[in-house]
Amino acid sequence: MTTNVRTPAELEAAERAVAIGTFDGVHRGHRAAIEAVKATGLRSTVVTFDPHPRRVLGYEVELVTTLGRRIELIDEIGPDELLVLEFTPELSRLEPEEFVRAVLEPLGTRVVVAAESFRFGQGRRGDLDLLRRLGLDVQVVPQVEGVSSSRVRELLRAGDVLGAADILGRPHEVEGLVVAGDQRGGTLGFPTANIAVEPGLLVPAHGIYAGSALEHRAAASIGVNPHYGGSERRIEAFLLDYEGDLYGQNLRLELWQRLRDERAFASEDELVRQIAADVEAAQQAVRPS
């Protein structure tokens, strides 16, 4: 099992191969880098940052995964160690050479695995050539066009969860605490779990989705519920063949396929018929992999 730590001082002395980056979403490119450090024969170490560096620099960034889920996904790949470094304004101002001395040298880094586009240090002035000049062995992971966290965000904002899953190597997930809602779903025969996600997490485009949660297929709604004149975004999921109280629990909802736009209906009967059709579509949906 991966050893998760917060400071380099918690790691025992060793020669290390390091994959370094934010790893938001832990997509197929990230996985390739982590597998490459595992293959070096050295202590395989992943260094990631929290909060996201661009947030520290004053930019708004919606994250694909929570830090906790990021750690879980990296752990599933199986490096020896995962170091979560706090990204601070002071760290962002380090010159590239200072960054290497402050972050990589204390780890006993011998090999750095990264994509050719990897940049670090103040103004992103550090690159792989600088790492080589500083005496580090650099292994370049081939970068596949379109495989990036930024592209995942673009696809999710467009509601293309299938395209996002192709880059991630798994379905995108929406995760959060189940909180009380309006109880309308129950009165219509389709009780839903109302999921409150962490602030700053990216939520896909409004619409109706097929997916799963707790190993049950699910029909999910993301949006403002226009049939009832809503204005606040909500994430609600009806779990097929599930009985039980989910309030107060953390629920992880996989999104497999976007079924349709959200809309208002001429009557409640028409709404119920459409929900039934959505549930049937969710029953037939195929999980992307």
Map each language-model feature to its residues.
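Short acidic-hydrophobic, aromatic-tinged amphipathic segments that line or gate anion-handling sites
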Residues: 1-10
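Generic structural signal for residues in well-ordered beta-strands
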Residues: 4-5, 82, 138
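N-terminal catalytic cores of NTP/NDP-binding nucleotidyl/phosphoryl-transfer enzymes
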Residues: 10-72
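Residue-level signal for inorganic ion chemistry
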Residues: 27, 74, 112, 164, ...
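N-terminal Rossmann-like or analogous alpha/beta NTP/dinucleotide-binding catalytic cores
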Residues: 53-134
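Glycine-rich, Lys/Arg-enriched anion-binding loops that position phosphate/diphosphate groups
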Residues: 127, 132-224
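Phosphate/ribose-recognition catalytic cores of enzymes acting on nucleotide-derived substrates
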Residues: 182-289
